[in-house]
Amino acid sequence: MNMIEKILAKASGKKEVVPGEVVIAKVNLMVMHDLSANFVTRVFREELGGGSILDPSRIAFVFDHNFSPATEEAARTLHKVRRFAVEYGIKNLFNGGHGSLHHVIIENGLWAPGQIIIGCDSHTPIYGALGVFATGEIGRAHV
């Protein structure tokens, strides 16, 4: 098996996986910047009815797009995401000034080789350079 197959096998509790096989794997971390976090939190509340989050430590929000909001609407967006993080116990909330999403995750050690990370943007696969299976652009509603 290649590296990705090994990671997926371990995360799904299988001895091995093969290309084309559908697996249910444990995701180690979900990463979102402020814009996608706003969408995801709204879908979670309004379309999925809220509820509980199994493990808030496996979620990270990084404000790197509108961290210095130019409009009231942008400020409200950040406020909503902050409120959501507090309400659901999400400690990995990085306000503006920490850097871009994926640098923040790497620099704060929120990853380890062999893990699975998902995100909402096309840069998420950068973690592959660190021995992580990472995929982005899966669709904000799917996170």
Where are these regions (language model features)?
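Fe-S-dependent hydro-lyases/dehydratases of central metabolism
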Residues: 1-142
